[in-house]
């Protein structure tokens, strides 16, 4: 970034209901969106033909629109299925990249489905216990500590 700020520089961009810092490089700035990691950001920017060294605030409206459309429709732009974060969806069997608020909704739906079918993982979530097989005898205790009274 040059020392002189361009005329059309935006310090904060609003993309997919997320505030993006315009001073950061675009590849790292769009990782602020839920469901977009560094690898996915790089692939999207390559498909959109945007310089990776550009700052997010230097993007034109057209470039921002291109990035958003590629992020929302990755399969149309030949991003492989194994790269996406929602593979073989339980309802429709489709592959997709879930972003921002949609990611929260999908996660909540998945947990509700697990609880409804009384799966072990769903029950552990319901009880507020560890889900992934960790030991819980000594760690992960909550609530007040109970002291030991000394015998006289």
Swiss-Prot record:
Disruption phenotype: Embryos have a reduced forebrain, kinked tail and inflated hindbrain ventricle. Gene3D superfamilies: 1.10.8.50, 30s ribosomal protein s13, domain 2. Keywords: Cytoplasm, Developmental protein, Ribonucleoprotein, Ribosomal protein, RNA-binding, rRNA-binding. It comes from the Eukaryota. The keyword Coiled coil does not apply. One of its GO terms (cellular component) is small ribosomal subunit. One of its GO terms (molecular function) is structural constituent of ribosome. InterPro entries: Rbsml_uS13_C (IPR027437), Ribosomal_uS13 (IPR001892), Ribosomal_uS13-like_H2TH (IPR010979), Ribosomal_uS13_CS (IPR018269). Its main location: cytoplasm. One of its GO terms (biological process) is translation. Component of the small ribosomal subunit. The ribosome is a large ribonucleoprotein complex responsible for the synthesis of proteins in the cell. Plays an essential role in early embryonic development. Belongs to the universal ribosomal protein uS13 family. HAMAP family: Ribosomal_uS13 (MF_01315). This is Small ribosomal subunit protein uS13. It comes from Danio rerio.
């Amino acid at each position: 970034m040059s020392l002189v700020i361009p005329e059309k520089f935006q310090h904060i961009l609003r993309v997919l209901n997320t505030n993006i810092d315009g001073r950061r490089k675009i590849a790292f700035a769009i990782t602020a969106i839920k469901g977009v990691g560094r690898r996915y950001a790089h692939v999207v920017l390559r498909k959109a033909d945007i310089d990776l060294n550009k700052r997010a605030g230097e993007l034109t409206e057209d470039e921002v629109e291109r990035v958003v459309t590629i992020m929302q429709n990755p399969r149309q732009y030949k991003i492989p299925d194994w790269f996406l974060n929602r593979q073989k969806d339980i309802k429709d069997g489709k592959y997709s990249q879930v972003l921002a608020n949609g990611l929260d909704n999908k996660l909540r739906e998945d947990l509700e489905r697990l609880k409804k079918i009384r799966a072990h993982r769903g029950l552990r979530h319901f009880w507020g216990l560890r889900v992934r097989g960790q030991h819980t005898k000594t760690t992960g205790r909550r609530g007040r500590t109970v002291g030991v009274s000394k015998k006289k």
